[in-house]
Amino acid sequence: MLVALVGGCAKSPSDKATQQQDKEPYRIGAVVDISGGAASLGEPERDTLKMLVDDLNAKGGINGHPVELTILDNKSLETEAVLAAKRLIDQNKVLAVLGCSASGTSLAMIDTVQKANVPMISMAASAKIVEPVKDRYWVFKTAQSDIVVANKIAKYLAAKGIKDVAFLSMNNAFGDSGRVNFEKAAPANGLNIVLAEKFEATDKDMTSQLAKVKASKAQATVVWAIPPSAAIITKNFRDLGLDMPLIQTHGIGNKAFLDLAGDAANGVIAPMGKLVVAEQLPDSDPQKAALLAYISSYEKKFNARPSTFGGHAHDAFNLAVKAIGEAGPDRQKIRDALEQTTGFVGISGVFNLSAQDHNGLGEDSMVMVEIKDGQWKLLE
């Protein structure tokens, strides 16, 4: 059964609420992986969305219209994601759908939103979510594309003089898309993939795959996964005593990975959105002020630091709000406004969307970081 969390204007100050009473609410839906395998992504996204809608309504909503945000948990299941999207479109009559947290659940919803002509803003990584653009007319996304991630990793390894690489990935849409794009980025940067192995998201041990890495001529290992798998394989990697760099992706950009991997996480290198190292950025960075503001608001509300995944939700919500504010309650005009958004300073990067690019983020949206003493440290 789908679980709905509804945010409205009930928590707004009385004067703002009174102003909103005469105007129809604007309805936005979100399908989030709050439980199940991708819960470590979905939980901070849910919390961020609830915080943002409360803050927005306290300030008067969108052009005086209160915002009703309905958040549905898809349980990290593709079938549940489709059902949730249909419910939001058919019953709630939402102007836009945000979600999902993961690539597989996001991809599963695309056909539904496209047929209904409803804008969708995913918070997941796979480039397939928005490509080819001609087949993704109604679909946008806020997480950095795995094309960007693959290129960042490949360039980093090449700069370190590494040639031979082992690649291990989750056997799902996230891992498969990462593998496809890393297989393109590697040769373009003079790298050889000497071994490619998969593991299931439910696996509790990846020693057999890592034993093959140890027996290969790999000089570095790239892992494409999210917690808990990403943490398990990191521990296995250390237990086997593999003496080479371990590179992961923005899929580990949360406290869950650090907690689950423990000391084994130290030394892991990954391209990340700037949120995890916001305080270490130069003051000239165009995102720094927005990042620090999000951290402050989230910590005040939840007594915890936000994750990069919460940042993807932050951007999805604010992009939708901006587009609705410009276009009004018209799905087609909202879609068009999204596509014309440029110079939008978000948490995941500075977005420059267009008819050719429904993600709008480049390699400058990410930095290389290393985990030292359980903390993210900027490498560049």
Q: Where are the language model's segments positioned?
A:
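Segments of small-molecule ligand-sensing domains
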Residues: 297-310, 321-375
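Short, low-complexity disordered leader/linker segments with a strong preference
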Residues: 1-27, 58, 380
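Loop/turn elements at helix/coil->beta-strand transitions in domains of secreted/extracellular proteins
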Residues: 24-27, 64-68, 91-96, 115-120, ...
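Extracellular/periplasmic Venus flytrap/periplasmic-binding protein
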Residues: 83, 128-129, 137-241, 284-285
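Extracytoplasmic "Venus flytrap"
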Residues: 22, 26-50, 72-79, 101-102, ...
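Extracellular/periplasmic periplasmic-binding protein-like sensory domains
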Residues: 234-312, 375-378
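Periplasmic-binding protein-like
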Residues: 88-101, 121-123, 166-169, 217-227, ...
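Beta-alpha junction/loop-to-helix N-cap segments that form part of ligand/metal-binding clefts
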Residues: 13-16, 25, 40-47, 59-130, ...
